[in-house]
Amino acid sequence: MEVKMIILLFQILAISTLKSDSADIPEGYIQENVALRGRATQSAQLKGEFAGFAHASNAIDGNRDSNYHHGSCSHTEGDNSWWRVDLKQVYTITSVTITNRGDCCGERISGARILIGKHLENNGINNPECSTINIMAAGETKTFHCPQPMIGRYVTVYLPKAESLQLCEVEVNVLFPAPC
């Protein structure tokens, strides 16, 4: 138990040396997308002719294809939409990478909040904020660095306006010690 605690403290120390605008990975560490291991859900799935393409799990399939009709994007329906991944365990998260829809409606994501925490109260919307998506071009993939490493099991993307939320990939980035 003490060894695990010491390793965790070293991880936090190494991660905290990252600047929020840095894409560098500290020596001796590897970055991994842990969202691929998770389970996704969303506030409400799009209904109608193209509903089959709209599943929450499409945003964690490892495919950054930004064309909604290719079946690799999620799509909510209704106001104040949210999408969430349960990572199934707690991690120290440094950043979240999002791929925006590219074939249409890229502006809809503006104002979305990326929230990370250990609680599901209010569907994770009450968890601390990592970053806000101010603007993203259609089809763009962008990494949002948390101001400091954040500990959490749930990553929620919440769009607090009257608009649907469309995500073509969500990657939750965690640093692990590199194998020797």
From Swiss-Prot:
Domain of life according to the entry: Eukaryota
Record-level GO BP terms: regulation of cellular defense response; regulation of complement activation, lectin pathway; regulation of innate immune response
Key words, A-Z: Calcium, Disulfide bond, Lectin, Metal-binding, Secreted, Signal
GO cellular component, one term: extracellular space
Signal peptide range in chain numbering: 1-22
Tissue: Parenchymal hepatocytes.
Residues involved in alpha-L-fucose binding: H75, R101, R108
Disulfide bonds: C73-C168, C104-C105, C130-C146
Main location: secreted
Region described as F5/8 type C-like: 31-179
UniProt key word Metal-binding: yes
Location within or outside the cell: Secreted, Extracellular space
Binding-site positions, Ca(2+): N58, D61, N63, S72, C168, E169
Keyword Signal: yes
GO MF, one annotated term: fucose binding
InterPro entries in alphabetical order: BG_Antigen-Binding_Lectin, FTP1, Galactose-bd-like_sf
Subunit and partners: Homotrimer.
Family statement drawn from the similarity comment of this UniProt entry: Belongs to the fucolectin family.
Role according to the record: Acts as a defensive agent. Recognizes blood group fucosylated oligosaccharides including A, B, H and Lewis B-type antigens. Does not recognize Lewis A antigen and has low affinity for monovalent haptens.
Additional record remark: Binds 1 calcium ion per monomer.
Record protein name field: Fucolectin-3
Species this protein is from: Anguilla japonica
